[in-house]
Amino acid sequence: MASSAASSVRPPRPKKEPQALIIPKNAAEEQKLKLERLMKNPDKAVPIPEKMSEWAPRPPPEFVRDVMGSSAGAGSGEFHVYRHLRRREYQRQDYMDAMAEKQKLEAEFQKRLERNKIAAEEQTAKRRKKRQKLKEKKLLAKKMKLEQKKQSEASSETQEQPSSGSEEASGTEDEEEDAPSFITGR
């Protein structure tokens, strides 16, 4: 008997250290406490709640044996049965109407979203086209400026070639003009 008592004795559980009671004052503190609790034991699985399923009424019965009316005799229990069936049917119809309205609103929302997306894409395309046009205009202006510069250089070279003697004299002037001048107004 002593051996059975010894085998049923379990080793003592490790004692948990006492924790101070912390009452969160706002949502951020509450979230912080939850995170700390989760991070104490990262191996433990985190409970993720399932999405609550939307309430739906019971489907209508496939076969109704006795179709009773509201004109059941006084004192009979049939009127209560009729009343409950009628209530369920009205509930089901209201639910179907609400779902149809919800689907209609969702479809309208999706259409509006699509229209907004198309309008935004059109606006973006318009602005992109404008940017490209400006870029091309700047590039064309730059090319024209380079061509004019080349033409002016070519024309100045053609003017300088016939007067080769004056070129030496004008060369010193060019050097003076190219030299940096720190005097304003020169």
UniProtKB/Swiss-Prot annotation:
Recorded GO molecular functions are: double-stranded RNA binding; protein kinase binding; protein kinase inhibitor activity
Residue stretches of biased makeup (Acidic residues): 170-179
Q: Where is this region: Required for RNA-binding?
A: 51-143
The UniProt entry's GO CC annotations, sorted and at most eight, read: nucleolus; spliceosomal complex
Main subcellular location of this protein, as a coarse class: nucleus
Coiled-coil stretches are: 86-153
| Keyword annotations from UniProtKB, A to Z | Coiled coil, mRNA processing, mRNA splicing, Nucleus, Spliceosome
- What GO terms describe the biological role, i.e. biological process, of this protein? mRNA processing; RNA splicing
Q: From the Swiss-Prot or TrEMBL record, state where the protein is found.
A: Nucleus; Nucleus, Nucleolus
List the residue ranges of the region (Disordered): 39-61, 119-186
Comp. bias intervals (Basic residues): 126-143
Which ranges are annotated Polar residues under compositional bias?
153-162
Region annotated Required for nuclear localization sits at 126-138
Where are the stretches annotated Interaction with EIF2AK2?
A: 1-50
PANTHER family documented for this protein:
PRKR-INTERACTING PROTEIN 1 (PTHR13507:SF0)
Primary role: Required for pre-mRNA splicing as component of the spliceosome. Binds double-stranded RNA. Inhibits EIF2AK2 kinase activity.
Its assembly, as annotated, is: Component of the pre-catalytic and post-catalytic spliceosome complexes. Interacts with EIF2AK2.
Sequence similarity:
Belongs to the PRKRIP1 family.
This chain's protein is named PRKR-interacting protein 1
Q: Which organism is it from?
A: Bos taurus (Bovine)
Taxonomic lineage from the root: Eukaryota, Metazoa, Chordata, Craniata, Vertebrata
